[in-house]
């Protein structure tokens, strides 16, 4: 028959308990030695019996070295866990603080909008009223400042436009004055202006006089000149000229 499963509980029989302790202790020490050799691991095993007797095993008999290493690791682990716990606690604390602050701000915002005023007493309502009046005062002050700045800017632009308008008017007056002076000069010097203009308009004739026949007007003028020349001459000379 196979061996039955041992129930894991305290052995009440003192002798059986002592025998089991001796067997299990030897097996445990043997397993510690095997894992140390096979796996090249540092193993430290400490066992105290019911009577307080110490049984131990350490790789290369370096119990102190292993315990010191264990203490360093344990301390670092505790510090890390403590730091993480502290950080986690700080984050939770900060979250609660921020959440409360946000709720307070939202509540104040509703009060400023005239909502949820039923929960406020007389003193709180008076404080809210003073806060609103102070806010309105700052708002009006800022509004007036912006209005004054806007008016000053418009006045500056107005002055600039007026100066430009004056400059244009001055230029126009000077042009009108120059035009009037030119017209007056032309009125006081008509011959000079007309002769200069006619000289510009007319070109000198290029036709040969000796080759063209005399016009009727020219022959008439020539005959009149001859008749005038005959006046006062003696009759014999006139007949001689006519012949």
UniProtKB/Swiss-Prot annotation:
Keyword Transcription: yes
InterPro entries, per database record: MADS-box/MEF2_TF (IPR050142), MEF2-like_N (IPR033896), TF_Kbox (IPR002487), TF_MADSbox (IPR002100), TF_MADSbox_sf (IPR036879)
GO biological process: cold acclimation; negative regulation of vernalization response; positive regulation of transcription by RNA polymerase II; positive regulation of vernalization response; regulation of photoperiodism, flowering; regulation of transcription by RNA polymerase II; vernalization response
Biased amino acid composition, Polar residues: 179-192
Induction / repression: Accumulates during vernalization in cv. Bd29-1, but expression is independent of vernalization in cv. Bd21. Repressed epigenetically (H3K27me3 hallmarks) by RVR1 before vernalization and in the fall season.
Name by which UniProt lists this protein: Protein VERNALIZATION 1
Sequence segments annotated as region (Disordered): 173-243
Boundaries of every K-box domain copy: 88-178
Keyword Iron-sulfur: no
Gene Ontology cellular-component terms listed: nucleus
Gene name, Swiss-Prot/TrEMBL: VRN1
Disruption phenotype: Confers vernalization requirement for flowering in cv. Bd21. Lower expression of VRN3. Reduced freezing tolerance upon vernalization treatment associated with a constitutively expression of cold-responsive genes (e.g. CBF2, CBF3, CBF5, CBF6 and DREB2A).
Ranges for domain MADS-box: 1-61
UniProt source species: Brachypodium distachyon (Purple false brome)
Keywords: Coiled coil, DNA-binding, Nucleus, Transcription, Transcription regulation
Subcellular compartments: Nucleus
Coiled-coil boundaries: 122-178
Function field: Component of a grass-specific mechanism of vernalization, a process by which prolonged cold exposure provides competence to flower in daylengths longer than 12 hours. Involved in the exit of vernalization and confers flowering competency at the expense of freezing tolerance, probably by promoting the expression of VRN3; this process is essential in cv. Bd29-1 for flowering but seems do not occur in cv. Bd21.
GO molecular function, a single term: RNA polymerase II cis-regulatory region sequence-specific DNA binding
């Amino acid at each position: 028959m196979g061996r039955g499963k041992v129930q894991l509980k305290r052995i009440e029989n003192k002798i059986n308990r002592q025998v089991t302790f001796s067997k299990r202790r030897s097996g445990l020490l043997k397993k510690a030695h095997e894992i140390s050799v096979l796996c090249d691991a540092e193993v430290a095993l400490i066992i105290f019996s019911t009577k307080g007797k110490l049984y131990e095993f350490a790789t290369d008999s370096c119990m102190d070295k292993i315990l010191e290493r264990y203490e360093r690791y344990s301390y670092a682990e505790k510090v890390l866990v403590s730091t993480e716990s502290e950080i986690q606690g700080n984050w939770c604390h900060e979250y609660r603080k921020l959440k409360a602050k946000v709720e307070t701000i939202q509540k104040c915002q509703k009060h400023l909008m005239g909502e949820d005023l039923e929960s406020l007493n007389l003193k709180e309502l008076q404080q809210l009223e003073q806060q609103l009046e102070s806010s309105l005062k700052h708002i009006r002050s800022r509004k007036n400042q912006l209005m004054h700045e806007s008016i000053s800017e418009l006045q500056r632009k107005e002055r600039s436009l007026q100066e430009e308008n004056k400059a244009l008017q001055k230029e126009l007056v000077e042009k009108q004055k120059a035009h009037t002076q030119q017209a007056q000069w032309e009125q006081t010097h008509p011959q000079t202006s007309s002769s200069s203009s006619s000289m510009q308009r007319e070109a000198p004739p290029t036709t040969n006089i000796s080759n063209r026949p005399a016009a009727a007007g020219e022959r008439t003028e020539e005959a009149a000149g001859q008749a005038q020349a005959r006046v006062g001459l003696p009759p014999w000379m006139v007949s001689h000229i006519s012949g």
